[in-house]
């Protein structure tokens, strides 16, 4: 349940704030990372379900949650790629290319040559 995971993260963070030097700090940090990763994975799964239903705008919202809230998880790049795919599947090729360009300019994201190549292939293959 996402609400209970979010509540747990909040409570663990509160513990870390109250007891920064605790011997349990490392375990608490690991638990937060694990819970955030689970929440990101759930949003990715929701996005994939929307894609299957051809509800691309809803899928994009799910992927944006990963990008905006769970940017520090392993799903960050996948979420960006899936937004590009959703735009391409809606024949919004120019928007997909602009999204990639904006991503390249964003200081927080690292767009590798491999990612860019894959994104351009996704745009070409899905539009």
Model-derived features with residue positions:
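Acidic, polar-rich low-complexity tracts and alpha-helical solenoid repeat scaffolds
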Residues: 1-127
